[in-house]
Amino acid sequence: MSAVEQHIPNDQFLQKLTAFYRDSKIRGPKSVYVTMKPYDGRTKAMPKGSTFKEGDEISCIFRAKWGSKKIATEVKAKEVNKFHTQYSAIIVAQMVNLEKRKKTDDEKKKTGATKA
């Protein structure tokens, strides 16, 4: 992406996010990073201590990164529920990719002591 971030449509973002998860399972880096922040259309940072005004139309910006590939979309307040439902479905479908974390010896001792 360039210095000014280009936002893609929500449906296209979800399709590319699904492709990121699928590709991360097959090849390349395993981690897909997704962030969500409030967004009011500014391209420059807000001064410290300032907040959104009540009259402002607040939306959310979703960003995803997999390896060197980055995508972003702006979700308007009216579309949040629809987007969140679709996003949740993608996350649930991709949970099969999660790997169980291996416990260290210290963690095994702690859990064994609490069970007794």
Curated annotation (Swiss-Prot):
InterPro entries: Signal_recog_particle_SRP14, Signal_recog_particle_SRP9/14. One of its GO terms (cellular component) is signal recognition particle, endoplasmic reticulum targeting. One of its GO terms (biological process) is protein targeting to ER. It comes from the Eukaryota. Keywords: Cytoplasm, Ribonucleoprotein, RNA-binding, Signal recognition particle. It is found in: Cytoplasm. One of its GO terms (molecular function) is 7S RNA binding. SUPFAM superfamilies: Signal recognition particle alu RNA binding heterodimer, SRP9/14. Heterodimer with ZK512.4/SRP9; binds RNA as heterodimer. Component of a signal recognition particle (SRP) complex that consists of a 7SL RNA molecule of 300 nucleotides and six protein subunits: srpa-72, srpa-68, SRP54, F37F2.2/SRP19, F25G6.8/SRP14 and ZK512.4/SRP9. This is Signal recognition particle 14 kDa protein.
